[in-house]
Amino acid sequence: MGFLKLIEIENFKSYKGRQIIGPFQRFTAIIGPNGSGKSNLMDAISFVLGEKTSNLRVKTLRDLIHGAPVGKPAANRAFVSMVYSEEGAEDRTFARVIVGGSSEYKINNKVVQLHEYSEELEKLGILIKARNFLVFQGAVESIAMKNPKERTALFEEISRSGELAQEYDKRKKEMVKAEEDTQFNYHRKKNIAAERKEAKQEKEEADRYQRLKDEVVRAQVQLQLFKLYHNEVEIEKLNKELASKNKEIEKDKKRMDKVEDELKEKKKELGKMMREQQQIEKEIKEKDSELNQKRPQYIKAKENTSHKIKKLEAAKKSLQNAQKHYKKRKGDMDELEKEMLSVEKARQEFEERMEEESQSQGRDLTLEENQVKKYHRLKEEASKRAATLAQELEKFNRDQKADQDRLDLEERKKVETEAKIKQKLREIEENQKRIEKLEEYITTSKQSLEEQKKLEGELTEEVEMAKRRIDEINKELNQVMEQLGDARIDRQESSRQQRKAEIMESIKRLYPGSVYGRLIDLCQPTQKKYQIAVTKVLGKNMDAIIVDSEKTGRDCIQYIKEQRGEPETFLPLDYLEVKPTDEKLRELKGAKLVIDVIRYEPPHIKKALQYACGNALVCDNVEDARRIAFGGHQRHKTVALDGTLFQKSGVISGGASDLKAKARRWDEKAVDKLKEKKERLTEELKEQMKAKRKEAELRQVQSQAHGLQMRLKYSQSDLEQTKTRHLALNLQEKSKLESELANFGPRINDIKRIIQSREREMKDLKEKMNQVEDEVFEEFCREIGVRNIREFEEEKVKRQNEIAKKRLEFENQKTRLGIQLDFEKNQLKEDQDKVHMWEQTVKKDENEIEKLKKEEQRHMKIIDETMAQLQDLKNQHLAKKSEVNDKNHEMEEIRKKLGGANKEMTHLQKEVTAIETKLEQKRSDRHNLLQACKMQDIKLPLSKGTMDDISQEEGSSQGEESVSGSQRTSSIYAREALIEIDYGDLCEDLKDAQAEEEIKQEMNTLQQKLNEQQSVLQRIAAPNMKAMEKLESVRDKFQETSDEFEAARKRAKKAKQAFEQIKKERFDRFNACFESVATNIDEIYKALSRNSSAQAFLGPENPEEPYLDGINYNCVAPGKRFRPMDNLSGGEKTVAALALLFAIHSYKPAPFFVLDEIDAALDNTNIGKVANYIKEQSTCNFQAIVISLKEEFYTKAESLIGVYPEQGDCVISKVLTFDLTKYPDANPNPNEQ
């Protein structure tokens, strides 16, 4: 889809110099203060697209140059160019330049003519004349205020049908004038033809006078010969026909006997089939009951399987978690055992090393005995000297040991607390996993419960509805049976009525939708008291068949003739001419229009009912009917409730007893409907009983739902207990332990500080004691070769202390690891027990599922087998039902054949009697003709016999029944039969006449001709001798007039063809636009209103030629009732007008749409809706360029073009562009408005 990319303006209106505006996005808003030149930008777009100067708010093209309106033009030329971009094609430039006082058009910088320019724009969908690309300021309000005629003018402009209006009017005038000329010449020709005829008659009178004299005698002979000839032909024909009919009667008797035997055989076969059908129905009922019992068992088995599968999945998940924990704990224990072995190995290596070192170092500092004694003496002396210091140091040592014990205790407690915290964390993790499992199970259970509840609700509703409906059906059936009992439904239809009903059904099938039915079947008096009156008024039209068109009626008549049906009356709706109902008659007191007391369906048969009823009135009694019929200044057709009819002509008719019999047909029609209703209710009762049998399935579902609800309740209780008790308690204990652990650090640090401080004091005391020892052992140390006595003592003591300390570290590590190993072993055993337990559970569940699946499959197999058997029975039932129907049809056909044969037999017997009567009549006619010829002395040409053989006695009439009279007549007829007449003088054409109507017509013609000849002969006077000259003159004049008439007729035909052509073109243009707009406007109005309940309608006042009259436009605002356009609020009118604007734009849409302040009359809500609609449409249907002053509107755009003024001799417009796509909309969803 193409779009407007850039606009380049130079010295156009308020835009001084050259300015490039753009790029334009799919939805661009032009904003700026009043008077800044926004509308001038729209004028620039209109200008470059070829808009007329008058629509650009200036008088001349020069006034469009910047500064020209104030007398200071910025230049002698100005131009506007547009860059149009299309995907997959090069950009095209369209430019319009003002040079002097005219425009110059360019495409891609090449100068072209205006028509070429327009054609290129039209290829893009831009129609200059229709202005389908822009909406000027105030146009929305203008459209909202338009009346229907003005709306038509708008459509004329958009569709360009208005371009043809002048030519349309011109050709219409030419057509009317040509038709008037033709009519004038026709009347002139007619008058001259009458003159010619008169002159011709005068001439012929003279010729005819003599000719008639000769022809009168010949005509008399011809007439009598004609009568006698055809009398003899008819007698011969009747004799042959009589013999043929007697043969047909014999054949018919034999055929009837054969058909009756066949009918008896078919009845036996039908009885057998119906018994078989009833047996199948019984088996179907039993299988259906069996299926209803088996289905809940299958549902229960399936539910058990599903529940057990869910439990298995949960158990498998728990097994995986337990195995995971077991594997992790096993790994931790393996690590601890490895660490224990490593510590033990390190301890052994240390002991071995110490043993080796003690052996190598033990011999270095060995003292002699005297040196040992001296060492002990000096040691005792040093102790005495430092006794005070030793006591003080001993006290420090005791305190230090006590604090060291405290420190060890705190550190041990810290380690234990850390172990307890780890244990609590594991317990918390276990609690959380249990909660997750419970929540998952509860969610699954809730879903299952919802499904069960939903199924329970559906089944409950279905069963309850079935129960209610069964009660209703039983009540209705009781009522129907009572009504049928009252109506004595055992009435038997005559074969004639059956035949008519069959033909009616046949033509309905042949012409579905075109044949509606008989009038009596399509209407019903509103009350029973009106039945006789309505029957009287409808009369013979009661049985008339209503069809949609004359063609359908003729086709039906042809079909009925082919089927040899009785004559029928047809009322074609397109052919009937009906006078409108006189509304004043509804105001008469004591009377109602007959059409008002009749219900009818479907509605479009009203025309036929109006035709049958007219403006007839129905009154309660005869006096009121007579008063209203004849009492006023104007007569009316009225009927009383007893059937007395008063016609306008003054004729009064009654016939109450016959009318009552006819009126009973309304009740018979009701009985037929009651029978149909009874059959329909019986079938529905069977279906509802099937639905009621689902109660067992409902109870099963309710039981399953209750069990699921109880399990859900226990799970929720367990979840709540786990959350509130176990998890909360563990979290509380963990928090308490963490708090205790946090307190260990400060206490340990305090003890360590005390120990360190005491160590410093002890160090000072030791140094003092060392000084005393150094003084006492000074000489001894030199003797044994050490710096001081402590070096000697520490070699042994220090080593022993280090070894003891190292051994203690090893013991502590082993103790710690042993405790952890014992704990991990206990936990590992618990995890192993859990794994074993879950493995057993999974195995057990899998075995149970296998059993349940087999049980489910067993039930399913039983159901499938039962359903297959049921379907087989149903198929057998359908087949048997089809056979019964076929057999019934065969019997019906045989009955029809029997009825037809019977009817044909009766018909043949009637025909034989009629032929014998006709034969007797023809013989009597021949006797009378011969007798008349003899009496009138008309000489007949005879080939055998003479005129004397004709008897003078009159033939006996049909009323004579005596034997002697009949014998005498037969004797006369036999004697006259011997007379043979020579028909050689009779014209062959007269002999060839076959049909009775044709013979009668020829006879009348001959008689009339004879009468005329005799009459003319008596009246004719001396002929006019100048008649020939007058005839020649009139003939020349007639030829001249005929030529003029023919020329005028051809001119009229040509003018009408020209008019019809322009009329069709104008209608096609207008209708194409109107249909497109009318189709799209409702959808657009809904989209603008953001409400699917909104409705918009367009309708022409004149559908044949819509451009000659107005177009109605109505809208139903969301949440409101239908109101005329004038009663809508201002905002609603504006939205409606916008809907019409966008719908018009959808007809041959331009790629972009320029709109000037269409939101002026909208409130914030409607502004949002319109803006969102434009935003939606701009993404796919068209580019929107909108001038707006309202923030609620232009914030929805993809880009803004800001226009601001600079003051000078006149306003100078400047332009800024702003891309809004970089700033996402705070409300991106337009549907939220």
Curated annotation (Swiss-Prot):
Keyword 4Fe-4S applies: no
Sequence positions that bind ATP: G32, P33, N34, G35, S36, G37, K38, S39
Subunit structure as annotated in this protein's UniProt entry: Forms a heterodimer with SMC3 in cohesin complexes. Cohesin complexes are composed of the SMC1 (SMC1A or SMC1B) and SMC3 heterodimer attached via their SMC hinge domain, RAD21 which link them, and one STAG protein (STAG1, STAG2 or STAG3), which interacts with RAD21. In germ cell cohesin complexes, SMC1A is mutually exclusive with SMC1B. Interacts with STAG3. Found in a complex with CDCA5, SMC3 and RAD21, PDS5A/SCC-112 and PDS5B/APRIN. Found in a complex containing POLE and SMC3. Interacts with BRCA1, SYCP2, NDC80, RPGR and BRAT1.
Keywords: Acetylation, ATP-binding, Cell cycle, Cell division, Centromere, Chromosome, Coiled coil, DNA damage, DNA repair, Meiosis, Mitosis, Nucleotide-binding, Nucleus, Phosphoprotein, Ubl conjugation
Function recorded in the entry: Involved in chromosome cohesion during cell cycle and in DNA repair. Involved in DNA repair via its interaction with BRCA1 and its related phosphorylation by ATM, and works as a downstream effector in the ATM/NBS1 branch of S-phase checkpoint. Central component of cohesin complex. The cohesin complex is required for the cohesion of sister chromatids after DNA replication. The cohesin complex apparently forms a large proteinaceous ring within which sister chromatids can be trapped. At anaphase, the complex is cleaved and dissociates from chromatin, allowing sister chromatids to segregate.
GO cellular component: cohesin complex; cytosol; kinetochore; meiotic cohesin complex; mitotic cohesin complex; mitotic spindle pole; nuclear matrix; nucleoplasm
Region (Disordered): 284-308, 348-369, 947-969
Gene: Smc1a
Residues where Phosphoserine is found: S358, S360, S957, S962, S966, S970
PTM annotation, UniProt: Phosphorylated upon ionizing radiation or DNA methylation. Phosphorylation of Ser-957 and Ser-966 activates it and is required for S-phase checkpoint activation.
Stretches of the chain forming a coiled coil according to its record: 104-124, 163-503, 667-935, 988-1068
Biased composition (Basic and acidic residues): 284-293
UniProt cross-references to PANTHER family, sorted A to Z: STRUCTURAL MAINTENANCE OF CHROMOSOMES PROTEIN 1A, STRUCTURAL MAINTENANCE OF CHROMOSOMES SMC FAMILY MEMBER
Domain SMC hinge: 515-629
Protein name: Structural maintenance of chromosomes protein 1A
GO MF entries: ATP binding; ATP hydrolysis activity; chromatin binding; mediator complex binding; protein heterodimerization activity
Coarse class of the protein's main subcellular location: nucleus
Similarity section: Belongs to the SMC family. SMC1 subfamily.
